[in-house]
């Protein structure tokens, strides 16, 4: 598993087509906020396997799975590309 500081650095360094993100470490994960609006974009929670993270999105008033099929877990780079590309993450941002 990548260290917390390494994960933070990789998130910040990612190319975000809708503007940058501010990354806040909290509650066993990383919350991504839009630097343009301050809105919540996504939450990435490391699961302890290699560099895999669970991807969550802000839904109504809580973090939830971004689909109808349960938790979405993927390697960090794939998760960053997923969040950057999918417009529903940016609805509140």
Residue ranges and their predicted role:
Residues 7, 40, 75-76:
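Amphipathic alpha-helical interface surfaces
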